[in-house]
Amino acid sequence: MTKLFIPYIMGNKDLIENATLLSENGADIIEIGVPFSDPVADGPVIMEAGQQAIKQGITIDYIFEQLEKHGNQIKCQYVLMTYYNIICHYGEQAFFEKCRDTGVYGLIIPDLPFELSQRLKQQFSHYGVKIISLVAMTTDDKRIKDIVSYAEGFIYTVTMNATTGQNGAFHPELKRKIESIKAIANVPVVAGFGIRSPQHVADIKEVADGIVIGSEIVKRFKSNTREEIIKYLQSIQQTLNN
């Protein structure tokens, strides 16, 4: 099976242009970050991009409006990465309805406890918007079983610990953990931690069904030319499916 390539971008004024470029250069699913004032799960690069977007006046309304008008330019599925506070403030039902109407495939909600995600699934599954499960590598096995048994779309494995050694290879324990999750999962299991280079991709693709690249993509959209970004995306894509 081909491996999933899931790049992350911050929802900003270049949202549609950046997402279109990614979708034309190998992205299978694009994660669109919704800027938030207190992004507890974000690293420094994404946090800074979020602050910039807030300064530009970017809101969830702006993102929905752009997706409504121009989402058809994005040639692959896209998910929103948002904190629960934004959904709560918008109104849960209205939010899910708007996601459905703007073609959003799913939601990644990093601060959402498993129990609350279950309630949202029960209440709003008829909108067809998937709630993507996050599994931290520190989560105990029983909890993982519970999360995985209700997973939809794909499972996003994350970790807060240092994940790459001196040689840039991923810790064997992480790989074992991904394999144990895959053994009980009915959806793809993707890795989303510290992946920056084709070398990282080559290492982690042995076990994962796909990869998420966040900070590195955000960094490149900030400082690279369009041509350089395309070249980077091609190198990731080739490594992933070679």
Curated annotation (Swiss-Prot):
Pathway assignment: Amino-acid biosynthesis; L-tryptophan biosynthesis; L-tryptophan from chorismate: step 5/5
GO MF annotation: an example: tryptophan synthase activity
Keywords, ordered alphabetically: Amino-acid biosynthesis, Aromatic amino acid biosynthesis, Lyase, Tryptophan biosynthesis
CDD domains referenced in this protein's UniProt entry, alphabetically: Tryptophan_synthase_alpha (cd04724)
Cellular-component GO terms for this entry: cytosol
Class of this enzyme: lyase
Description of how the protein assembles with itself and partners: Tetramer of two alpha and two beta chains.
Function recorded in the entry: The alpha subunit is responsible for the aldol cleavage of indoleglycerol phosphate to indole and glyceraldehyde 3-phosphate.
The protein's name: Tryptophan synthase alpha chain
